[in-house]
């Protein structure tokens, strides 16, 4: 995630023990501040200039090797090591905030990469060489990397990217690149719908779009105004073993999954699945929201995280019968029948804002490092006519409200965490209510918010 800085960046880099790093010029300042705390050999720090390096490779700063210049005399053939790559080998890591704490590195294997890119690109979208995908989503996200880019690769299609999403320039870019397919997240669609209407709204070649998080309220408005025939809404846990795809082009659904899954009853305060007197879980009825569990078997293996203990925490045993295993997605879905489902919400200590997953534990830990804060509880709150949840932090001052410098606190937060994780709202409390087991009553705070 290119927004990560300082301690979070150090943690994420060291988590996978990298042998080398490639740093883009635009991110050089962020990496330079943490370089001494990352165990990468000085001869393996590669630099790429922020320009058309095929014409002008640029000049690497001291301590870096210019990757483009150093590559000029190398063979254009695939390296010998590529002959020994197998389905079960790790392809890359997708970093996720999971449900608590610092980012975890989810292992994405070559076999899963090929399955996911083929299912989205060939089965769901029927991509071909005449197609062009326009993607404004970051490629460190599974939607941008696996869904959009993977679909383009599967269909031998074109792939047009933009460094940062622009609502005002979106359709101009689509026309310029002659795009037939767009990748999205729900927030992106809302920004486009909020733009002033134009006579050119439907003047483009886009016939299909793929992504996640498009809310029912914006679904029909987007489809009608921009004349996009096929909305391929999907659900996939980048650190899990299941995915849903709206292949049949129904409205307001994430579609169906070929994997085995169930929705179970859960505790509304803790978010944990509920077990009956026999120790087994209860499936919810059609139309009722429930916690999504995905069966782990030979058909749907769980690659997990780099840390086996982190993986063990998301695996549930003896769910419906002795010996079965399920992946706990931490997400709430609703079964709408015919094998189709709707996404409802996220559980746990994570909420989604500006297309990013925000870990409340991480926000709390950073705020608690401020000398003027005694207690901090972070959570996501709903705002009318927006996607996801905005951050709110309830705090108790270390001394008094009069001594709390709000401007300095905001500057501190912006320096220590990504901008999307900085809480939009601050609630100051004299004392934080706790449960009988001394846990903060986050559910009550959310309700009051």
Give the role of each language-model region.
Residues 47, 63, 72-95, 102, ...:
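Conserved pre-ATP/AMP-binding loop-to-beta segment of ANL
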Residues 1-11, 25-31, 157-176, 358-363:
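ATP-dependent adenylate-forming carboxylate-activation enzymes
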Residues 154, 176-185, 193-268, 301-305:
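Gly/Ser/Thr-rich phosphate-binding loop
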Residues 4, 10-11, 19-23, 236, ...:
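AMP-binding/adenylate-forming catalytic core of the ANL superfamily
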Residues 72-74, 78, 87, 106-128, ...:
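Conserved structural elements of the adenylate-forming
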Residues 1-70, 415:
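Structural core segment of the AMP-binding/adenylate-forming
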Residues 114-132, 140-180:
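Conserved AMP-binding/adenylation subdomain of ANL enzymes
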Residues 88-101, 106, 117, 121, ...:
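ATP phosphate-binding P-loop of adenylate-forming
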């Amino acid at each position: 995630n290119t927004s990560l800085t300082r301690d979070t960046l150090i943690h994420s880099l060291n988590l996978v023990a990298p042998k080398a790093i490639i740093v883009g010029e635009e991110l050089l300042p962020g990496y330079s501040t943490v370089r001494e705390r990352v165990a990468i050999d000085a001869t393996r720090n590669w630099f790429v200039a922020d320009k058309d390096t095929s014409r002008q490779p640029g000049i690497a700063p001291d301590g870096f090797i210019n990757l483009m210049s150093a590559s000029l005399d190398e063979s254009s053939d695939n390296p010998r090591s590529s002959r020994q790559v197998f389905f079960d080998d790790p392809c890359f890591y997708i970093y996720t905030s999971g449900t608590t704490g610092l980012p975890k590195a989810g292992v994405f294997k070559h076999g899963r990469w090929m399955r996911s890119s083929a299912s989205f690109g060939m089965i769901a979208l029927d991509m071909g060489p005449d197609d062009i995908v326009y993607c404004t989503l970051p490629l460190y996200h599974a939607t941008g990397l696996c869904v959009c880019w993977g679909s383009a690769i599967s269909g031998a299609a074109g792939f047009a990217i933009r460094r940062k999403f622009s609502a005002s320039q979106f359709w101009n870019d689509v026309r310029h690149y002659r795009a037939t397919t767009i990748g999205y997240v729900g927030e992106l669609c809302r920004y486009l719908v909020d733009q002033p209407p134009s006579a050119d709204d439907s003047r483009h070649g886009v016939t299909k779009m793929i992504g996640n998080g498009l809310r029912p309220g914006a679904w029909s408005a987007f489809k009608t105004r921009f004349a996009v025939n096929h909305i391929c809404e999907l659900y996939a846990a980048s650190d899990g073993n299941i995915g849903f795809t709206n292949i049949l082009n129904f409205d307001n659904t994430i579609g169906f999954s070929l994997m085995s899954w169930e929705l179970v009853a859960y505790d509304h305060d803790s978010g944990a699945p509920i077990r009956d007197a026999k120790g087994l879980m209860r499936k919810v009825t059609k139309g009722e929201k429930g916690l999504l569990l995905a069966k782990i078997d030979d058909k749907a293996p769980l690659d997990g995280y780099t840390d086996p203990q982190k993986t063990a925490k998301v695996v549930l045993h003896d769910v419906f019968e002795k010996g079965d295993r399920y992946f706990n997605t931490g997400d709430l879905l609703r079964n709408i029948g015919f094998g189709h489902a709707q996404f409802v919400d996220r559980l746990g200590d994570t909420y989604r804002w500006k297309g990013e997953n925000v870990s409340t534990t991480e926000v709390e830990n950073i705020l608690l490092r401020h000398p003027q804060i005694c207690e901090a509880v972070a959570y996501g709150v709903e705002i009318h006519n927006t996607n996801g949840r905005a951050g709110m932090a309830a705090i108790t001052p270390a001394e008094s409200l009069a001594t709390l410098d709000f401007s300095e606190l905001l500057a501190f937060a912006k320096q220590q965490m990504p901008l999307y994780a900085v809480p939009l709202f601050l609630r100051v409390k004299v004392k934080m209510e706790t449960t009988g087991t001394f846990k903060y009553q986050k559910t009550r705070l959310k309700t009051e918010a």
